[in-house]
Design a protein with these regions (language model features):
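N-terminal nicking endonuclease/strand-transfer module with a His-rich metal-binding environment
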Residues: 1-193
Length: 193
């Protein structure tokens, strides 16, 4: 982010720059690592596709026409996610500064690894372009960017996620929430609506 971008996000949003050092990513194999800011999402996607010999169907189009990325946000209740991320440390969530001393707890890493493994097992680890955990916002959470590519190495958003109609899509999402609830159960997180 630029300095101007950070200042605006802190003014308007729920970011705390003094906790940015707590953010991390999960890399292939479930490895916890600092976020590689040198590789933006577009570059990660291009590298992933090139390494697998898959062409981006939106390449060369003036406007994208195909769903080539699925973005997930994983999280839970604010209170429980803060417990996982910060334990019993005193964090100032209101001033959005002065939290440089806060340490990231191993529980948030283990939770993220469990969610990563769920996504990898369900959709293929090779299709995960990024999995980033934010602990610098009011409610810690994970962002996952996934390529909807099937076993034939074809982009297949509708086949994988949507089904034939809205009812199929709704049922798929309800089922997905049920599956995630089983993963989150051990972390004291209950299924949302």
């Amino acid at each position: 982010w630029t300095e101007k971008g950070w200042n605006q996000a802190m003014r308007e949003g729920n970011y705390d720059r003094s906790r940015e050092h707590l953010n991390f990513e999960i890399r292939p194999g479930g490895m916890v690592a600092p976020i590689d800011k040198s590789r933006p999402l577009t570059r990660r996607m291009a590298e992933n596709l090139a390494s697998r010999g898959i062409k981006d169907p939106n390449e060369g189009l003036a406007e994208p026409r195909f769903r080539t990325v699925v973005n997930f946000i994983f999280g839970g209740s604010t209170e429980r996610m803060r417990e996982l991320a910060f334990g019993n440390q005193k964090v100032d969530f209101e001033s959005k500064e002065g939290n440089e001393h806060i340490r990231r707890m191993p529980e948030i890493e283990k939770w993220a690894q469990d969610i990563y493994r769920f996504v990898a097992d369900k959709y293929g680890e090779e299709n995960i372009v990024s999995f980033i955990v934010h602990c610098d916002e009011k409610n810690p959470h994970a962002h996952c960017a996934l390529l909807p590519i099937d076993k034939d190495k074809k982009f297949a958003f509708k086949k994988i996620f949507h089904g034939q109609n809205r009812i199929d899509y709704k049922n798929y999402l309800l089922s997905l929430h049920d599956e995630l609830a089983k993963v989150n159960e051990k972390w004291g997180l209950t299924r949302g609506v």
